[in-house]
Amino acid sequence: MLTDMDISSRASLKNITEIGADLGLLPEEMMLFGHTKAKVELSVLQRLAGQRKGKLIIVTAVTPTPHGEGKTVTSIGLTQSLNAIGQKACACIRQPSMGPVFGVKGGAAGGGYAQVVPMQEMNLHLTGDIHAVSSAHNLGAAAIAARLFHETRLGKTEFEAQSEQAFLDIDPNEIRWHRVVDHNDRCLRQIHVGLGDNNGPEYESSFDITAASELMAILALSHDLADMRARIGRLVLALNTQGQVITAEDLGVAGAMTAIMADAIKPTLMQTLNGSPCLIHSGPFANIAHGNSSIIADDIALRLADFVVTEGGFGSDMGFEKFCNIKVRQSGQAPAAAVLVTTLKALKANSGLATEVDSNVSNIHVPNISATNINAPDQARLEAGFANLNWHINNVARYGIPVVVAINRFATDSDAELQWLIEAVNASAAFGCEISDAFIQGEAGAIALAQTVVRAAETESQFKLLYPDEASLEAKLSTLAEVGYGATGVSLSIEAKQQAQQLTALGYGHLPLCMAKTPLSISHDPSLKGVPKDFVVPVRELVLHAGAGFITALVGNVMTMPGLGLKPGYLKIDIDAKGEIVGLG
């Protein structure tokens, strides 16, 4: 079979204006980037303000493994197949970060004959939204550092006289706004700034990957430009020496940060291999951020299409949980159905009986258990791994959403094992189960899945949140740990307990939680496979994101700046003699 790159390069593409017109966009509602991409103007929301909305489908997965489960392949394949059976469908997915592209995970345009094209344009830069987020974020970091420098140099009286600005009395030990870059670079996790003469007061800082920036979350959760401006104004950049918050509005930088992102708030329209529309917007990771594409993209698509297919990152304990408890809480748009992606490989890898070892990813294997051939038939491992799938089925169902299981078929899969899995799923709480061959067959490979999803979406969804706004932060943490992950409880570090008290006292206790934890286990420990039991979730730190409207709980050893592995993806990427990009996947 051709590589994803070859398939994308050989694809016959429509002009993006034709894709937009078929979706229902007017010419003046598209800001063109060549023939393959267009920004969608937010004026379309005003034109379609009274339009009946379509049905939202959320795609999630079992606990991820290094083999890949094919969640984006399924999202794109389902969208293509929905259009093929006469439903008007649009996909809404996140923009890939270049960190994973050059690291382990690779791109995020789908694969095979279920991908967004041109895939190289989507995976590298796209229309520059992530760069805009990086620039706006780092402007905030530069502004707080410069303000600290001048206030320290001049003192209160002279500073206010010369600058005609209020003295903020910044505590250099309480600067909360660090810098970001769209790469995996572990050496930037802990740095000192202001070194040397006349370079400002020294203080400890760090870099996060841009996908973890609060501005990325704001981009994903804003309803319009005015909402984004207000949210950026609420960003907490630092505390003063009295422990009071200093916001981007206080610093006077919120307007400029918004200006940098003025075009980034517009989703980017692309197409799939069969000409289905796809809106790509925002790129928060699901392990260290909330892991879903934008409310704005969903809103536009829902006013133009019968079905909108979106996805949450990683497993249902990660992106799907945050989709429900953060995104839906803010958008008010509940899904009509969910699709849960699994593979035979994933279930065997999650069995706990044997685990594949990948040198590119640290701490993913169970010690002292030898690896076996993941492709070989193994009924014992499959049955043991089904517990993980069944947990995720029940996890989705607890939100009151009908769930359809999609088995992403690989060429090496055993027919007997596939049949056993279908029967096991049909005996579970799932609405239905279908095999997807979208990777190999494109739109023809997920027709049955599309038909079952339509039937599921016709049932009456009884969506419910996991916890109410008014619950205390400690109660929300306990609910997420015990109900969301199956833990026996949660333990807060001394620092986290103090932060919970401080955040509550400052009036932020009503905000939902964004759990930053490993995606490689339902628990906080990546070595615990299957359905872990008898564990306690350790919360080491709580981080306020007042602009985005949630509080991040850092769990275990999760990092907000990834590192490159032993065999990074950039080793395969180059330019050929024709100037074409090769090795991207």
Swiss-Prot record:
Cystine pairs: none
Extract the Pfam families matched here: FTHFS
Pathway(s) where this gene product acts: One-carbon metabolism; tetrahydrofolate interconversion
InterPro entries assigned to the protein according to its UniProt record, in alphabetical order? Formate_THF_ligase (IPR000559), Formate_THF_ligase_CS (IPR020628), P-loop_NTPase (IPR027417)
**What is one process in the GO biological process aspect for this record?**
tetrahydrofolate interconversion
Enumerate the residues binding ATP: 65-72
What keywords does the record list, in alphabetical order? ATP-binding, Ligase, Nucleotide-binding, One-carbon metabolism
State the reactions this protein catalyses. Answer: (6S)-5,6,7,8-tetrahydrofolate + formate + ATP = (6R)-10-formyltetrahydrofolate + ADP + phosphate
Instruction: Supply the enzyme class, top level.
Output: ligase
EC number, as in UniProt: 6.3.4.3
User: Mind listing the GO molecular function terms for this protein?
Assistant: ATP binding; formate-tetrahydrofolate ligase activity
UniProt xrefs under PROSITE patterns: FTHFS_1
HAMAP family (UniProt xref)? FTHFS
Q: Which family does it belong to?
A: Belongs to the formate--tetrahydrofolate ligase family.
State the protein's name: Formate--tetrahydrofolate ligase
Native species of this protein?
Shewanella baltica (strain OS155 / ATCC BAA-1091)
